[in-house]
């Protein structure tokens, strides 16, 4: 009986393997196209030129991408893309 309890405890004491998020390298051409589309959409939303839009961050999630940026007036926004890089929406922050 003690042997069975000991074996049960040994099985419980081993920590589960650490899972790490998979990072897929984004094609540079795709990310440049996404940035251009984000700048275009932000310029339309904020009624300004694309040259006055700065994209400052690019984040990859499990099934989507986000690009963060701001206008020359320091208005912040986030562009969201699906897993294939298609534009979903622009959120003002």
Swiss-Prot record:
<dbReference type="InterPro" id="IPR025728">
    <property type="entry name" value="YsaB-like"/>
</dbReference>
<keyword id="KW-0732">Signal</keyword>
<feature type="signal peptide">
    <location>
        <begin position="1"/>
        <end position="11"/>
    </location>
</feature>
<keyword id="KW-1003">Cell membrane</keyword>
<dbReference type="GO" id="GO:0005886">
    <property type="term" value="C:plasma membrane"/>
</dbReference>
<keyword id="KW-0472">Membrane</keyword>
<keyword id="KW-0449">Lipoprotein</keyword>
<dbReference type="Pfam" id="PF13983">
    <property type="entry name" value="YsaB"/>
</dbReference>
<protein>
    <recommendedName>
        <fullName>Uncharacterized lipoprotein YsaB</fullName>
    </recommendedName>
</protein>
<feature type="lipid moiety-binding region" description="S-diacylglycerol cysteine">
    <location>
        <position position="12"/>
    </location>
</feature>
<feature type="lipid moiety-binding region" description="N-palmitoyl cysteine">
    <location>
        <position position="12"/>
    </location>
</feature>
<keyword id="KW-0564">Palmitate</keyword>
């Amino acid at each position: 009986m003690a042997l069975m309890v000991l074996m049960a405890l040994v099985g419980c004491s081993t920590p589960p393997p650490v899972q790490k998020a998979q990072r897929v390298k984004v094609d540079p051409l795709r990310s440049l196209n996404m940035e251009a589309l984000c700048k275009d959409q932000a310029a339309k939303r904020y009624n300004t030129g694309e040259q006055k839009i700065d994209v400052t961050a690019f984040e990859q999630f499990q099934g989507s991408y986000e690009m963060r940026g701001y206008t020359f007036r320091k208005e912040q926004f986030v562009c969201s893309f699906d897993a294939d890089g298609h534009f979903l929406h622009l959120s003002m922050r």
